Amino acid sequence: EDVIRNFRMQADGLIRYQGANGLWHQLLDKEDSYEEITGTAMFVFGIARGVKQGWLHPDYIYVAWEGLKGMFTKITPEGDVTAICAGTGIMPALSFYYNRPQWKNDPMGEGPVLRALVEMIDAPKYTEIKAEQQYDKIK
């Protein structure tokens, strides 16, 4: 019960920071940081799994689908995965995170992207009008 409650609280917190195009930023609460696919993929996977397992309200699937749409903007027609943040440890200054390089086709980003894509294969669909109305309530 504690784990599920914590999961729900984290999902509630994360969705507030999802960008208009579905992606999350390298620094979640800093819109001037770059949009990053690895974290987005992890959040899409977790939210979709949460809905499918009944841990999150079904309307949360809208957030996952919007994230997936955003992810597709960072995957080239050739299948290259872009906007992967270089490995990052805990650093003392925000400037370090702003200046992290973005990689292409790095396994640290490709793995979460593949997991998110597979999780979304059988994810529930949503009625867009209803979901858009509910999304504000979720946020």
Question: What would you call each of these model-derived segments?
Answer:
Residues 35, 41-139:
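CBM-like carbohydrate-recognition segments
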